[in-house]
Amino acid sequence: MKHIIFSFCLLAAASAAYASSPKKSSVIPASKVMTHDPVLAKQGDTYYLFATGQGISVMSSKDLKNWKFEKPVFEEAPQWAVETVKGYNGHTWAPDIIFHNGLYHLFYSCSAFGKNTSAIGHATNPTLDPSSPDFKWTDHGKVIQSVPNRDMWNAIDPNIIIDENGTPWMNFGSFWDGIK
């Protein structure tokens, strides 16, 4: 009988936890948004937040106060990343996004935690609006890679700037050997 009561209590607790967790379609106040390495982009009247997460987490908001989850950039880990970065499981880090030459360019980190087995990837989309018929992320693969016992730097945490001549530049780095 004790096992039945314990099992019932455990099931009830799990159900309550599931019911109280935010659903992907629910609106979440900004004070409840928990994320790592966020970057914002605005298209039209909508802000889009990209962050570290499985497939690159994406959220949207009209007012920066109320957010909703969108589908991740990648439903599955990019094959090039799985093949290139041993230990990478689709948890993609520190995205950065710019709008340049009519496309949104998203740069992201694929890494094995605690190692400099890493690479920075690049994807583009003509729009950030998931309801647009033009919405489609195109992955362009690896931009740069770091390899243990070869490189004394780590290819993670990309940041893109565009200079006064319209030329994009990337910097990246970590505690391995600073910014490159």
Where are the language model's segments positioned?
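Carbohydrate-active catalytic/glycan-binding domains of CAZyme proteins
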Residues: 18-180
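Bacterial Sec-dependent N-terminal signal peptides
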Residues: 1-23
